[in-house]
């Protein structure tokens, strides 16, 4: 079904800067709303329930799966992540633009359901920089960092499945690129026709 709102789906390997870019975009564009995913992993640092993620027990997550409450869900780095079907559909059905941070598996699955979803992949400028960012983050052991780098090879190979790719070398430039993608999507004929349906009908544009 065509909804008037736009759905932007952002994926990246750990350490590429996805969350920082999305946060910066939302500070610049108040018209875009975050879609908060559910996860079984524990909070990191200053993360809060309902802000970065809804943190669930495995049993709570199982219950949502059984109720078919997730648009998609997947195993990522040893934990489960899911996207609430109701949260997404309600917002874009009311003309809201929604941005979702998710893994590449979930992004591709969402595109199958919402064909108008805009998939954006964030790449690091190099393997060396990706390793350095993971180390500077200070959240993972050396063993976990190596696992994340190994998984990153698989994840980045899927960038070809996405509509847009941003290389996050200079943060300010990457934010500009992300904002440009959002603005350009809103001006596409198909997006304008969905968002401004009454205007198109009044102008007799099919």
UniProtKB/Swiss-Prot annotation:
- UniProt binding sites for ATP: 12-19
Q: Would the keyword Cytoplasm be found if you checked this record's keyword annotation?
A: yes
Q: Which UniProt keywords apply?
A: ATP-binding, Cytoplasm, Kinase, Nucleotide-binding, Transferase
Compartment(s): Cytoplasm
Recorded source organism is Polaromonas sp. (strain JS666 / ATCC BAA-500)
**Function, please?**
Essential for recycling GMP and indirectly, cGMP.
One cellular component (GO) term of this entry: cytosol
Q: CDD domains, from UniProt? A: GMPK (cd00071)
The main location class comes to: cytoplasm
Q: Which reaction does it catalyse?
A: GMP + ATP = GDP + ADP
Q: What is this protein called?
A: Guanylate kinase
- NCBIfam families attached here? guanyl_kin (TIGR03263)
Q: GO molecular function: any one?
A: guanylate kinase activity
Its EC number(s): 2.7.4.8
Q: Where is the Guanylate kinase-like domain?
A: 5-183
**EC class of this enzyme?**
transferase
Record-linked InterPro entries: GK/Ca_channel_bsu (IPR008145), Guanylate_kin-like_dom (IPR008144), Guanylate_kinase (IPR017665), Guanylate_kinase_CS (IPR020590), P-loop_NTPase (IPR027417)
Keyword Aminoacyl-tRNA synthetase assigned to the entry: answer is: no
**Family from the record:** Belongs to the guanylate kinase family.
């Amino acid at each position: 079904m065509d909804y008037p709102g736009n759905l932007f789906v952002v994926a990246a390997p750990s350490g590429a800067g996805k969350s920082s870019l999305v946060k910066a975009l939302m500070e610049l564009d108040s018209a875009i709303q975050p879609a908060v995913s559910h996860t079984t992993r524990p909070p990191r640092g200053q993360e809060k329930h309902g802000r970065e993620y809804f943190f669930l027990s495995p049993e709570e997550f199982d219950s949502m799966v059984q109720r078919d409450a997730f648009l998609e869900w997947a195993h990522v780095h040893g934990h489960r992540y899911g996207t609430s079907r109701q949260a997404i559909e309600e917002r874009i059905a009311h003309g809201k633009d929604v941005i979702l941070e998710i893994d590449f598996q979930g992004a591709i699955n969402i595109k199958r359901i919402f064909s108008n979803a805009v998939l954006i992949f964030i790449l690091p400028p190099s393997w060396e920089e990706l390793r350095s960012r993971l180390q500077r983050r200070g959240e993972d052991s050396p063993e976990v960092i190596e696992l994340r780098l190994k998984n990153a090879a698989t994840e980045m190979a899927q960038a070809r499945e996405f509509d847009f790719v941003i290389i996050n070398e200079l943060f300010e430039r990457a934010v500009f690129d992300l904002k440009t993608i959002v603005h350009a999507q809103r001006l596409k004929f198909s997006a304008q026709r969905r968002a401004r349906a009454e205007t198109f009908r009044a102008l007799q544009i099919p």
